[in-house]
UniProtKB/Swiss-Prot annotation:
An MF annotation (GO) of this entry: structural constituent of ribosome
SUPFAM superfamilies: Ribosomal protein L16p/L10e
PANTHER family recorded: 50S/60S RIBOSOMAL PROTEIN L16, LARGE RIBOSOMAL SUBUNIT PROTEIN UL16M
Composition bias type Basic residues, residue spans: 1-17
Family the entry assigns: Belongs to the universal ribosomal protein uL16 family.
Organism listed in the record: Ostreococcus tauri
One GO biological process term: mitochondrial translation
Keyword annotations of the record: Chloroplast, Plastid, Ribonucleoprotein, Ribosomal protein
Protein location: Plastid, Chloroplast
UniProt name for this protein: Large ribosomal subunit protein uL16c
Length: 141
């Protein structure tokens, strides 16, 4: 699973979920993409589950790009722990996703396979998504 090698701060603030994605909101590498329509946190486990589902459905064909990275640690306390005694230890990693962010890109497969594999990956995401096709994409004859 994805996680940063090192971070500036071990325990960041939670932050807010306002606004649109200003960067990472256009198809840059592939011909097809999965785009987030609402804000949320996507964990490293969910990113990996989506990647596995897409690569298995495409039978390892084509090329897949993951356009998000879990760079924010989420802390948790043990169950039935008394209040106080500081903030909990980092438990898992998340990627902060805003509406418009491209999550995955895919190239080298037909549109039907890309659409179906992205649908399977979308079921594993905690946010609503939509399927995008690059503007200058021309289907192979």
């Amino acid at each position: 699973m994805l996680s940063p090698k090192r971070t500036k701060y071990r325990k960041p603030h939670r932050g807010n979920r306002k606004g649109q994605a200003l960067r990472g909101n256009k198809i840059s590498f592939g011909d097809f993409a999965l785009q987030a329509l609402e804000p949320g946190w996507i964990t490293s486990r969910q990113i990996e589950a989506g990647r596995r589902a897409m690569s298995r459905y495409a039978k390892r064909g084509g090329k897949l790009w993951i356009r998000m990275f879990p760079d924010r640690s989420i802390t948790a306390r043990a169950a039935e722990t008394r209040m106080g005694a500081g903030k909990g230890a980092p438990d898992y990693w998340v990627c902060i996703v805003k509406p418009g962010k491209i999550l995955y890109e895919l190239a080298g497969v037909p549109e039907t396979i890309a659409r179906a594999s992205m649908r399977i990956a979308a079921y594993k995401m905690p946010v609503k998504t939509k399927f995008l096709v690059r503007d200058e994409y021309v289907a192979p004859q």
